[in-house]
Amino acid sequence: MIEKVFGKIIDNPKITLNGILGLTIVLTLFIPKLTIDFSIEHLFSQNDPAVEEYFSFRNDFGREDNVITIIYEPIDHYDINLFKELENIFYDLEELNGVERVISIFTLGDLDTRAWLGDLHGENSDWNRDTVIQKLEYIQSDPAIGSRILSKDLRFGAFILTLSDFANNHQDRSAVLKEIKRLTHETSPSWTYSGVSVLRTEYVGYMVRDNFLFLPPIALILISLLSYVFRNWVFVVLPMLTVLTTVIWLLGIMGLFGLEINIMTYIVPTLLFIIGISDAIHIQARFRENLNKDSYSPREAMLVTINQMSRVIFLTSATTSIGFIALMTTSISIVQEFGMEIALGVMIAWLVSITLVPSGIMLFKSFGRGRENTFSPILLWLSDTIPKRPWVFIIIPLFISFTAIYKIKDLSTDASLMDDLRPENKLFNDLKLTEQYFGGVLPFEVLLELENDQRTVDKTVIDHDILIHLDKLERLLNKELSNSRFFSIMTLLESVKRIRGDESSVSYDKNFIDQVLNLRGDQQIQLINKEKNALRITGLIENKTSSEMDKIYAKIDSLSRSFPPYLSVKCTGTTVVALRTNNYLVQSLVNSLGVALVFISIIMAFMFRNKSILLASLITNLIPIFTVLGLLSWLGVSIRPPTAMTFSVALGIAVDDSLHFLLRYRKELTQCTNRVEAIKATIMSTGSALMITTTILVSGFSVLLLSAFLPTYQFGMLSAGMIGTALLCDLTLLPALCLVLPHKES
């Protein structure tokens, strides 16, 4: 049945190619429906209690991750024209669609005459630099907003913008940020744009940039290698058309089902260009081999080739897909989508390869011999040396592996949220500037909650004895996160005391505090929930690793144990949830490696039904993974989600070469008199195709080193390293193990 289908494809290449073209055109129509976005929520685990707590916090207090910090550095810090520009910008920013509120050096002047900079546009304005310096120093020392809008040395100033909830999507955020840049572009200060909202918007820009940056060099590498190996334009064009068609089909399917491109799935087209081309190369290489070796007509050679290779590359595509499908065992939606989409893309590449490549070759009658055995000198040396000294090729890689594996126990999973950016990146430097002068950009929330029971019938969270505990909590945060900025009822009341001229020791009663809170209005930062049983300390903190934050959580827990039993403390916010998710995701991805290994082992066991062959295959494919893990530990590199994800993915890809080698070895055993001859024949026949496909994979993954994202950079580096190491093992360790391990030779 299958042979008849392939016969129809080969005999009717025009119909086959037109069918592929028609389906490609239809799916292309759905690509414009794809949307590009990045949200912190994409990284949240679906089953994490901390996520539920965060969304509960958002329901009570609103979003805390919709802040933009615009920093300015003036040329002349005290020139009146500078302040005229800043005041105009302040009013313009307040009018922007999507901006809920703006805080600046002009905000405090409406409440406190000592912070009023004067009538900047009046004809009789008396501008005195010393007076301005005094006023700016007064503004900077305000407990509530001073350190957020002016640096301590007055060198930098800032506007703090809070976006409306409806503007919390990529399209509206981009429009707001574009308008902000337009308003500030032709003014005298230099400007820096920072904050989580800017981070999200710029991330999307980096995604688009990376795709445009990756594809040209990858295409050049593919075309160059295919041209060198096959020396035939048809054999160059067909693999390129295969991966291009695969990408279009997958993007069309994503658009059809309403999927979006996010911080992980943006790399899917690039990966399919790298991974999806190997099937076409194996088909073309085997067709050349059959045409050259046997007395087949081109049609017979193609039919034999497609019958042989359709099954082989289906199995190798299945093992590659398993590596990606294993990622779906995590509870992070974007990781699940990434695994599903790449797995589907790999199988699409298989389908396109077994239809488009044979049809194209038959249509254009590309039956020339081309270049044979591109890597024959290396393969000849291996086929001659390995049978003579198999134990050398076993002991050396095992020794290197055990040396590296010894350090695996010291691997760290410590990470921070800004680890995604490379240190030389402009956005990274902008965030660091904000950290240095304005306390950071990462949202951190601490809640002091009052339990509703008989002990608290007559209590409210603004009782003096409860505010004392809130003050202790805020003092601890200021001590442990000394470069960060926090805001609560306590800092608000300190600011009120300063404006009123009250002593710092004065305590306000509940009625007065209620009046202060009511006067702030709904558009201001909410410091107490509607039920009035929770107080909020909101902060923008500097970048911290998960281990550093764990120490802070421990100190907060220790302090909270000294509070009355009816008070509890919770830490939440996107920073808290994202760091906890990072630790969970690393563990989950390590588990996915185990899942991939189990399923791949089952496939190998079913195919070969030989314990020795299965053992040889597992050793060959696990050594690169554990060796790289050990090297990471030696180099002091932490295991993070992108590095953890690499291992199950690379395992799925690396097993392909082992399968090709072992399937050919099994075939050669039936045709040769002993295993030495079978190993030599296998290395010479399969080795060239393996080296071609691995060279393409390693070169393609190496292009990812150009990415602005450190996770993509690490994913590319580790994948290239593991796949390259896997090839070395497949061409040295695997044949050596096949020679020394006992197994039937028929």
Each model region followed by its residue ranges:
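Hydrophobic, glycine/alanine-rich multi-pass transmembrane helices and their short helix-loop junctions
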Residues: 225, 314-357, 361-362, 601-604, ...
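Hydrophobic alpha-helical segments
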Residues: 250-367, 706-707
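Juxtamembrane segments of multi-pass membrane proteins
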Residues: 390-393, 397-516
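Hydrophobic transmembrane alpha-helices and their membrane-interface caps
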Residues: 235-283, 613-662, 702, 729-733, ...
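Interfacial segments of transmembrane alpha-helices in multi-pass membrane proteins
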Residues: 11, 205-261, 329-333, 591-637, ...
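Signature of alpha-helical transmembrane segments and their immediate interfacial
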Residues: 1-38, 354, 359, 363, ...
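Extracytoplasmic
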Residues: 55, 61, 84, 126-233, ...
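Pore- and gate-forming transmembrane helices of large, multi-pass membrane proteins
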Residues: 240, 279, 293-330, 618, ...
